[in-house]
Each structure stands twice: as structure tokens, then as C-alpha cells.
Amino acid sequence: MMIGSTEFTFDKGCGEYVGKLQVWGRETDVFLDTEHAEGESIDKIVTEKINWIEHNKEKIVKAFMEENDHYVDVVNEMIACGDFKADGPISADDFVNALFVDNVTIWVKGVDTDFALDLDAEPDYLLGHLAFMEIDNQYHVEFGGLNG
């Protein structure tokens, strides 16, 4: 299956199409669940959702930080104790600027298409975890917990 100029291949292990697209300036794994797609233009739907992620980084990060701004203090405590290597304390901006999209999953269902993404950080301010962000078909963003 082609999405734009990118080939997505079916992965029997996960039962989804898998490909790589640019999200927030990085090549990102994208998983497509097309089980409930009924003749829709999958290419159009996927492109719309990826473009929405591209243009709504601030909204996604804000939804994450509303429930997780304490991570800045946690990392700073770890830096002070020598448990996290850094040149000095980090700010909230440092934390936010370290976030990137690790992967995206899109459940293609026409107008009911919803999607999710995992945020990661470099440096690893999430301490080996990924932040699961859920986005419904009305583009409401919600933090769904930490993975890993």
C-alpha cells in the first residue's frame, strides 16, 4: 500500500500495515489498522492525520505536560544526586524541546478514524518510558499513561 510516496507493508505479526513517515522532523514508524476501512481513501485519511500531528505539536505537548510537568523536578533531582548525567539542571523548555514522536498508530475508520502516538525524549527525560497520547476523531488529545 502506498501513502504518498511511502510504501507500507503488511506485518502479519501485528496485523497492521507498517511504514515510515516524517513527523516533527524525524523518520517515524507509522502503523495502520485498516480492518474497519470500507473503501475510504486510506492515503487521504493517513495524510490528514499526520499533517494534523505536524501542525499541532504544541497542543499534544501541552496535553502531556498538564499531567506530567513534575518530570522536570524528577530529572533535576536525579541530576543533583548524580543519577542522571547532564551539565546542569533542566528547564521546562529543555524538557519540552527534548520530546519527539516515537511512533504513530492510526485506526482507519472513515470519519471515525482515531489515532495515537508515543512520545519519547532525547535525552531520556522519560527514563525509558514512552508517553501514550490518544487523539480521537474530533482531535481531542489525552495523555493515556506511560509505557515501557
Describe these PLM feature segments:
Residues H55-Y125:
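Amphipathic protein-protein interaction modules
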Residues M1-A86:
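Long, contiguous N-terminal structural blocks used for assembly/anchoring
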